[in-house]
Amino acid sequence: MLKRFGFSVLSGVLLGLSWVEIINFFPLVFVALVPFLWLENQILQQKLSSAKVYVHAFVVFSLFNIITTWWIYHATLSGALMAFFFSAVLVAFPFWLYHLTRKHIGNKEGYVAFVINILAFEWLDYNWPLSHPWLPFGNAFASSPNMVQWYEYTGVSGGSLWVILVNLIVYFGVV
């Protein structure tokens, strides 16, 4: 259990550090989801409760939110805590759906769902009244706009797709 928690923390920290402009570690975003993907696979192989995937995704995205949007506390501490919590609750959902798809339908469909769920969630996050558009995966390159001049054609969602696919490729290369 502690090992699984460590992988959640690692994924959250890698994601968070890939957004920090001061150190410009954006390449970390290309491997940040790999520990979570490994963790999800362990939960699936060990036939553990699917709720564990949700809990671990919540840990990943709580850390990610705290590292990237810590500055919200300057406005109000309670507002920051609510933003951290509710954003993590929502972002964990597509990762849980990915796990359920893998578990009940199959691996291939699960990995397709992984891509679709994340991109669909990001689209919904842009277009609902409580929009929180700061943290799509494609925004990891904000400190290096020269890397993403092609966003002119694809938007940030193209960058998110890039990040998701590279994480999957790295994961399959490691596993």
Feature map (PLM): residue ranges:
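Membrane-embedded alpha-helical bundles of multi-pass enzymes
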Residues: 1-175
